[in-house]
Each structure stands twice: as structure tokens, then as C-alpha cells.
Amino acid sequence: MNAFPPPSTLLFLPCSATKNRPLHPVFPGAGRRLLTTLVNSAGALRDGRHGLAACVDWQSPDFAALDYYDGALYQVPGLRGAVAAAMRSGAIDVLILSGGYGAVYADEWIHKYEKQMDFAYWRRHGLSAVLEEWIELSGARTVYGFLARTTAYGRIVRAVDWARVRRGGRVAEAGLFALNFPGREGAQSRVPPALGRAVVDFIGSGFDKAQLLAREYEGHRFICEELGA
């Protein structure tokens, strides 16, 4: 099973509807399982996954989530390699918010499923509490999400009790990076690859927030919504 050093930064990424067998997986070995990490919120996550079991193709091959998801964000050149290398170095740990699984480690193995992220469903099943416990257990100092602002993913991350997380004393900064894209026309095709490139650039810059916010992606810049400040 994969073992990584304690991370200094946590990232949240969205899943993708497209899932394909990886040709060159970055996590070919057995991955971690979020359910075995959690203590207080494990039951809620388990129940949430059980309620969506019919959406999962249990006969499909399973692969690490970072390798399996193959939408526009995950097709950005260098994204998988950059994320995997940063995880192995202890720079980051990554949770992918998943419509079928709630949340999974980037190296956690999953089956193919057909289920969009449903904010109401996962709110009832305590997904925000799952994220909160994971943050606290990690001991990380900074937490960022790379998510579209108006999606269910963003709403789930905002629903975390960030004031309580910060009062715990470990998290010094938490933010939600989103492309400042006006309107919805063209967003579905342009925002995901911009998010992927931003993740690669953020890791490559040594997590330089100012540098990321100064760059343009698809003709627009990112904004960072502070969480719990």
C-alpha cells in the first residue's frame, strides 16, 4: 500500500464523468482507503457510498482515482505526474470529490460509476464533516480547493466548518481557487482544463499563490475565496 510523508498542503479536486483505463498509471500499486483513515465520520461516508452502490459498475476494473478520471482537467499534460510526485515528496495530499464515492484519495482505487455530484445527498451523509476530519488528521497548514465556484463541489467545501478548523490552530490558510469566468457560456469546456493547468503551475511554483493569481488562463484570471478567515 502507498505510504506518503505527512503533507504540508492539502488539495481538493473534482472528479470527472469520463473514466478510462490508464495506459501509464502513476499509482500502479495498492492505494490507501479514506474509510480506514477516518474515525468519527467513517460511518457516514460508508453509508453514503452504500446508498449509491447501484450506480457503481462493480464488474469494471478498478484503478487509482487519479489515473482513472480522464476528463479535461485530468488530460492536462503533466498533471498526474506533478500531483503524484508532490504527494510522494510530502508536499501535498489530495482528495478527489466524487459523485459516486463522496471523496477518495487520489491514489485510492475505484470502479467505474455513473453519478454526478449531488450536494443535497452528500450533505445529508456528512461529506463536509468527512473533509473536516481529514483536514484535522492530516496536520497540514494550508488547504486549497481547485473547483468551479458554482458547482456542488464548491458548495461541499464551503460547508466545512472552516472557523472551527482554523480555531484548531493547525490550518493557517484555506482557500478556494476558481477561474473568474463571466457567465456560463463556454464554461464547461474552458474551466476544467484551466483548473488542471493551474494545479500544475501551483505545484511547480512551490505553491506560490500570488504567482498563480497573476497568470491568465483561457483569457481570465483565478480568484481565491478565503475560507473561514
Question: In which residue ranges do the predicted regions lie?
Answer:
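Peripheral peptide segments
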Residues: 1-229
